[in-house]
């Protein structure tokens, strides 16, 4: 993977995340995942979650309170690697997003 501008699919994912943070509605965000998707967090006591419904329930139970901005991106095939900063300035992290067609099949989020 090489650094490059954020892919359109990853930009849509981040926009959907930020919209859900603002609205508190995680159903639309969860619809971006395959029915059997997995989501893991590294560095926080949450998950892992398997399945679209479990992902939506996980976000609803422990919703993020801050939006994020991608600071660096790299893509290779069906994988986008994103580095991000919380907009409040409280930290940074990474997202590895694996795609199956236009839906997310696997999401791993790590916190620095």
Predicted regions and their residues:
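Short, low-complexity N-terminal intrinsically disordered segments enriched in polar/charged residues
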Residues: 1-27, 31, 35, 103
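A beta-strand edge to alpha-helix "cap/lid" segment located at domain peripheries
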Residues: 2, 56-112
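A solvent-exposed, acidic/Ser-Thr-rich amphipathic alpha-helical stretch
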Residues: 28-76
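A structural signal for well-ordered alpha-helical scaffolds and beta->alpha junctions
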Residues: 10, 14, 52-55, 90
């Amino acid at each position: 993977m090489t650094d490059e501008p954020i892919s359109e699919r990853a930009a849509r994912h981040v926009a959907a995340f930020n919209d859900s943070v603002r609205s508190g509605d995680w159903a639309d965000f969860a619809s971006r995942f395959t029915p059997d998707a997995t989501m893991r967090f590294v560095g926080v006591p949450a998950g892992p979650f398997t399945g679209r419904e479990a992902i939506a329930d996980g976000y609803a139970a422990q919703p993020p309170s801050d939006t994020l901005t991608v600071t660096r991106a790299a893509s290779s095939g069906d994988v986008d690697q994103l580095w991000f900063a919380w907009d409040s300035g409280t930290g940074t992290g990474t997202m590895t997003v694996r795609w199956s067609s236009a839906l997310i099949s696997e999401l791993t989020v790590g916190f620095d």
